[in-house]
Amino acid sequence: MTPVAVTSVAPVDIIHDLKRPKRATESSPITLPDVFSRAVSQYPNHELSFITSSVHDSSMHTTTFTEFNQRVRALAQAMLAWDKPAGAVIVIYLTEHEDNVAAVWACLLSGYVPCLQPALSAQQAHKEGHVAHIKNLFSSATWLTNESGAEQVQSISGLDIHLLSELKASAGVGMDFSAHQPNPDDEAILFLTSGSTGFSKAVVHTHRTILAACHAKGENYGLTSESKIMNWVGFDHVAGSLEMHIAPLLYGASQLHVHVSAILSDPLCFLRLIEENSIQLAFASNFLLAKLTRDLEKRSDLFGKFDLSSIKRINSGGEAVVSSTAQAFARTLKNLAKDGDASFVISAGFGMTETCAGCIYDSINVLETPPSYEFLELGTPVTGCEMRVVNPEDGVTPRPDGESGELQVRGPMVFVRYYNNPEATSSSFVEGGWYRTGDVGIVEKGKMRLSGRIKDTVVVHGVSYGIPELETYLQTVEGVTHSFLAAAPYRAPGQETEGFVVFYSPTFGLDSEDAPVKLYATHCAIRDVSVKLITLPPQQIIPIPINQMERTTLGKLSRARLVNMFKQGELAKHIDRAKELIGIARGASFVALSTETEKTLAGIYAVILDLSVGDMSANDNLFELGGTSIDVIRLKREGESAFDLPEIPTIRILKHPVISNLAKYVDSLVSKDVSEEEYDPIVPLQLTGKKTPIFMVHPGMADVLIFVNLAKYFQNERPFYALRARGFEPGQPFFTTTGEIVSCYTAAVKRTQPHGPYAIAGYSYGGVIAFEIAKRLEAMGDEVKFTGVIDIIAHRARENDLTLGLLTLSHLLGLVSKQDINDLAPSMRPLTRKEQLELVWKLSPPERLVELQLTPEKLKHWVNVSGSLMECGKDYEPASSVSVMDVFYANPSRGSKEAWLHRLKRWTDYSRSEPSYIDVPGHHYTLMDFDHVARFQKIFRARLEARGL
């Protein structure tokens, strides 16, 4: 076979001529300040628009290039008062797009070099280590952040922290300011890598590399001064800052930057913004394509309702794009569009921080031209970029056309070096200036597609997780031979997102008598650690004898070799042996299904959880099998249908998740021999683990379904108990005072865990009750080492707004949207409770009512239970204090996050030690939902560990 030729668009020696796309003016800028200046002078009335994390579409803030220039120049002039030398690195740690854009340009105009800091780790030790590393790397510690960011790094000494709010306050008019004039090869912007193989590296991009990339992108995208783009990627990512801001700015294009929470929380927001703003270019990762498709493909009520004629191209990157997902998304857009003949171009691309984001693209109408492979091809390089695939062993020998190998790229958009790290820089390039991407690619007929990864990360829904960190934790699992474990990224055929496989050598022989029990316990522990760290269990866990785990000459286990053996079927005998032993272990504890009710329930469990009914045991637990809050609702609905019952109370499923126990309860319902159970607020959602239990108090909706998804992350770590309000069951009276609630819950906690130390937390309304329980326990002489207050201010419990309570409950049940809560509240307050319930019922999606098996009477009763709690809190006034407190806060529904944090800090008056205030993803109503619970649990568990629990 003939070696594959290097694929390029233009020779390197004429790249400078190619930096002038036909649609750019002849006076092409050579530095970033030139880009900014030209955009302002040539397109003064073109616009930058922003939607923050705390406002809705109607609160979009728009500013002209001219107005933005004045603000930036004023900030730059104020920055000079810091008296830093030209070229000083300023770490920018901000949340909102508008703040980031202004801060970066102010740094550039004042002669400083901005370094964009992504969200810091919730693990205190990791966060402190990272910040210290950055400080040493730059030989300085100047940070520009907001109050929330300052709060996160306040415990780290030696930092020179400047608040953006104070910088804005000190900024003057800025008219006399003379902007810094850099050279094209000066450092422009630094970007931090994910740190997946250690601490982050700082990627140095000069004015020249950034402008080369932006010219090439603009030419590829067909950008003009009349283009309109929409971006939701964070500004700390090269795709958000370079690809979707500086490149369009180079062409004078107007831009809309939307906080990611606005897109993820409302799938229709993406389409509405395209329609309302005539967006021509947008970005959507494979994860978002899949989510939007799932949420919208069955919304036949919206078919033909959106004017999507403006959108010319949707870029997709960050992870491989599944071809079937892209096609389903395009079909969904076609159905939703007013023009039934509309076509939609999805452009999968390849890029890295080191290449200024995308540098290889393949624009395709996936409905007219069906993709040839499981994942979309990534296409050909942009102008000036070259790519090749080589033998990964030597890094230089070209692979034949159609064969996989290490993907390498070169061109003027490739970074110049890693800041203060010559060793890493040197190892990243080979002779000829080729950059080693770390990805496995195939070039066939001039087009590139990826077939895997060499580098040590796994990408889950577009988020990169470090394989070395995962391996470090897995090495500590009992049953794993230390240093004989490797984890490697792997995407199974048909799987939408990347997964991973774990290879390890057991500390015990697989032929020993106790091997089944030990292997089962080891694999359960490996799954638990994996879910907690990267939100995903392994696709396969493969035990391999030590003498068959070959090492390289450097003493390392070769992930690439192990994955190749796995793909080739060479490890099949080890996989089969593991299945056999685990089957024996399950058989030892296996209890055969003995009654018709158990068999029927087992069938429902199997369908819901996608398991084989033949493997179901009578002692299987819904939650230990991976059941979620949605699965509880499905089990309730399917069970009521199967047994012809008017209702199986949700609380009974929560309290009886084991098949045999639930079967006995169902039998009692069928025979109408149900003995009335005494009210007990404790709902055990997870009972495994030896660490201090966590008690979680319900929010204002009174129920605990919202905690089901969270509880599973504590398996084999600590028991998780939820507290549910009184009044759901027939004959149960409502609570009448806060004191009654606290006395009842405290007694239940003491019955469940007689002695401290205790860990108590509450979500929203429950945060206030948790605070009162902690006070009561301390008054009884017990130690409370953790008091968690989740997103509620100290005096909120007394705010007796029954209308808002009804709407909040309705939102949590999926009956109304988050937007409806604020929109409907004013007009609903004058209505009677009956009229309010009727209005909510009319607004509720019929399919959701069927799914919940909800009737007007059930909704009314639920609302009454919730309302009774609000009535209890109407005279509540916080007093006294607890020894420790952790306050978790999300994005508010209105106003800034800083203002919300300021209100929350009143909790400081009620703690005898300085409380910790912890920023969590999502909004008040979504922080524990499916999209956010994985990140919330990591943050929450980190705080428990920080408190010594």
From Swiss-Prot:
Disulfide bonds: none annotated. One of its GO terms (biological process) is biosynthetic process. Residues 693-934 are annotated as: Thioesterase (TE) domain. The keyword Transferase applies. The modification O-(pantetheine 4'-phosphoryl)serine is found at S629. InterPro entries: AB_hydrolase_fold (IPR029058), ACP-like_sf (IPR036736), AMP-bd_C_sf (IPR045851), AMP-binding_CS (IPR020845), AMP-dep_synth/lig_dom (IPR000873), ANL_N_sf (IPR042099), ATP-dep_AMP-bd_enzyme (IPR050237), PKS_thioesterase (IPR020802). Inactive atromentin synthetase homolog. While the invA3 adenylation (A) domain is capable of adenylating 4-hydroxyphenylpyruvate (4-HPP), the invA3 enzyme is inactive because of its non-functional thioesterase (TE) domain. This is Inactive atromentin synthetase invA3. It comes from Paxillus involutus (Naked brimcap). The lineage of its organism: Eukaryota, Fungi, Dikarya, Basidiomycota, Agaricomycotina. The gene is invA3.
